[in-house]
UniProtKB/Swiss-Prot annotation:
<protein>
    <recommendedName>
        <fullName>Uncharacterized protein YqfG</fullName>
    </recommendedName>
</protein>
<keyword id="KW-0732">Signal</keyword>
<feature type="signal peptide">
    <location>
        <begin position="1"/>
        <end position="23"/>
    </location>
</feature>
Amino acid sequence: MNFLMRAIFSLLLLFTLSIPVISDCVAMAIESRFKYMMLLF
């Protein structure tokens, strides 16, 4: 039971740490797509 709680806690910690990285990647993708559309028009 203790091991399960520790695994869940570490997974949650990993998830919270990976949220900024994912949002940064999404923001970069949106920005590059926006610049590409600006070049087209």
